[in-house]
Regions:
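Long hydrophobic segments that form regular secondary structure
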Residues: 1, 121-126, 256, 369-382
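Outer-membrane beta-barrel translocator/receptor signature
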Residues: 1-19, 31-33, 114
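Transmembrane beta-strand segments that form the barrel wall of outer-membrane beta-barrel proteins
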Residues: 2-3, 266-275, 318
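Surface-exposed loop/interface segments of Gram-negative outer-membrane beta-barrel transport/assembly proteins
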Residues: 6, 23-113, 131-133, 137-250, ...
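Short secondary-structure subsegments characteristic of cysteine-rich extracellular domains
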Residues: 9-23, 283-293
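Residues on the lipid-exposed face of transmembrane beta-strands in outer-membrane beta-barrel proteins
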Residues: 20-24, 116-122, 178-182, 196, ...
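Solvent-exposed loop/turn segments connecting transmembrane beta-strands
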Residues: 276-281
Length: 382
C-alpha cells in the first residue's frame, strides 16, 4: 500500500497492489518435468482525489494566476478561515487558490487493473518442450468531478450553477501463444535450437461513457452524481458513450539457432502476421531476418593476444519489421454528422433560408492499406 499525502488543496493518492506467482510440477518422470503449470498475476487498485495538475490554457492557467498575484495577498482570511477576497486593483483580480480549489479539488478517479498469465509446459522428451501461454488484460476506471457555484470577483470569475461530471469505462484484451522448441547437438560441436510457434492477440474489447450536468440538488461533492441533477437541459447536459475498436492479430513464426564450438553463430527467423486492421487481401505481412556472429577470441591465432584482449565478437544482422499501428477499420470510408467541431450545413433552394444539418465524408476508404515494412541492417562488435 502506498499513500502519499500532500499539502496541496484536497489532494491524495492511494494504491494497492497484489502479485501472485507460482509454478507446480504435476507429473515428473525421472529427470523430466513431464507436465508443469504456473501463473503470474498482478492486480492494482488506485484511488486519486483532488488536484493532479494545473488547469487552464497555455496562457490563462493556475500557474499564471499564482504568479500574477501579489505575494502579500493572503490565501485565507485569518478571522473566518474562508478564502480571502483580493485587493481590488482591477475588476479582474481574484484569489487564485480559491479558483484552483473550486475547479480542481473536488474530484476522484478510481482505477482497477488485472494482468494475468497462465502457462502449461509439456516435456515428453528431453529438450523437447511444448509451451502454451494464455494472458489476459483487464482494466476499468471511473471519474467524478464537482465544481460548485462561486463568485470570486463579481465580473470575470463567476460561475452561477454547480456542475457535476462523471466518466468511466472498461477495457479487455487477451493473448494465446503456443510454441514447440527442440534443442540438439551433433558430436557435441554443432548445436542447434529450433522453435515453431503461433500467437493470437485480441485487443480493444471495451467501452467509454461520459456525462455532465448542472444544478445538482445538494451542493457538495458527496452527492455529486448525474442522477442528482435537477433537470436535463440542452446546452447544459452532455452525454456520450462509445465502444472501442476491436483489433485481432494472428502470427506464425519459426526460428533456428546454430552454434559451432562457440565460435560461429547464426540465426534465421521467419514470421507471418495477419492483422484485422487491414482489408481482406492485404492483412498478411511476411518478415524474415538473419544474423551471424564470429567469436574471434575463440580462434587459435588469438591465444597470444588474450592477455590484452579477452573477448572480441563481430556480428551482423538484417531483418524486416512490420507496423500495423492504426485505428481499426480505417480502410473503410466513414461519414459524420455535423456537430460543434465539424460544421456541415446545406440549403435546399434559396440560400437565404434556414440551413439543414448534413453529413460529410470524414475518412475516404482505402482498401490498399497494408503493413508498413521497414528494413534494418546492423554491423558491430562486442
Amino acid at each position: 500500500t502506498v499513500a502519499v499525502p500532500d499539502d496541496e488543496v484536497g489532494s491524495g493518492f492511494d494504491r494497492y497492489t497484489i502479485r501472485l506467482n507460482s509454478e507446480h510440477t504435476l507429473i515428473k518422470l525421472k529427470d523430466l518435468d513431464l507436465l508443469k503449470v504456473g501463473e503470474t498475476m498482478t492486480m492494482v487498485y488506485s484511488d486519486k482525489k483532488g488536484l493532479d495538475q494545473a488547469t487552464g490554457q497555455t496562457t490563462w492557467n493556475d500557474f499564471r494566476n499564482a504568479f500574477k498575484t501579489s505575494p502579500l495577498f493572503p490565501a485565507y482570511d485569518e478571522a473566518t478561515g474562508e478564502f480571502a477576497d483580493p485587493v481590488k486593483i482591477n475588476k479582474d483580480e481574484f484569489n487564485p487558490v480559491a479558483k484552483m480549489y473550486y475547479n480542481s479539488a473536488m474530484k476522484q478517479s478510481k482505477n482497477y487493473s488485472l494482468n494475468g498469465n497462465f502457462y502449461l509446459i509439456l516435456e515428453p522428451l528431453k529438450n523437447l518442450r511444448w509451451r502454451n501461454n494464455f494472458g489476459i488484460r483487464y482494466s476499468s476506471w471511473s471519474y467524478r468531478g464537482y465544481v460548485p457555484a462561486y463568485n470570486l470577483n463579481g465580473s470575470t470569475e463567476v460561475k452561477y450553477r454547480n456542475t457535476v461530471t462523471q466518466q468511466g469505462g472498461m477495457g479487455l484484451g487477451w493473448q494465446f501463444e503456443s510454441t514447440l522448441s527442440y534443442d540438439f547437438s551433433i558430436n557435441n560441436q554443432h548445436k542447434f535450437s529450433a522453435l515453431l510457434g503461433t500467437t493470437i492477440d485480441k485487443s480493444g474489447l471495451g467501452e467509454n461513457y461520459s456525462g455532465s450536468n448542472e444544478d445538482v440538488e445538494f451542493d457538495d461533492f458527496f452527492h455529486a452524481y448525474l442522477g442528482n441533477a435537477k433537470t436535463v437541459e440542452k446546452g447544459r447536459t452532455t452525454l456520450s458513450g462509445s465502444a472501442w475498436g476491436v483489433s485481432t492479430l494472428a502470427s506464425f513464426f519459426g526460428r533456428i539457432n546454430y552454434d559451432y564450438q562457440n565460435k560461429y553463430m547464426a540465426t534465421v527467423i521467419m514470421r507471418a502476421d495477419g492483422s484485422s486492421n487491414f482489408a481482406r487481401g492485404h492483412r498478411w505481412g511476411y518478415f524474415p531476418s538473419v544474423s551471424a556472429g564470429w567469436n574471434v577470441t575463440e580462434e587459435e591465432f588469438m591465444e597470444d593476444a588474450k592477455s590484452v584482449l579477452n573477448y572480441l565478437k563481430i556480428r551482423a544482422s538484417w531483418g524486416e519489421n512490420g507496423n500495423n499501428k492504426l485505428d481499426a477499420f480505417r480502410y473503410l470510408g466513414t461519414m459524420a454528422l455535423a456537430n460543434s467541431q465539424n460544421a456541415a450545413y446545406y440549403y435546399f433552394g434559396d440560400k437565404s433560408g434556414t440551413p439543414f444539418i448534413g453529413s460529410f465524408i470524414e475518412y475516404n476508404s482505402n482498401k490498399e492499406l497494408t503493413w508498413e515494412t521497414s528494413r534494418q541492417t546492423d554491423i558491430g562488435f562486442d
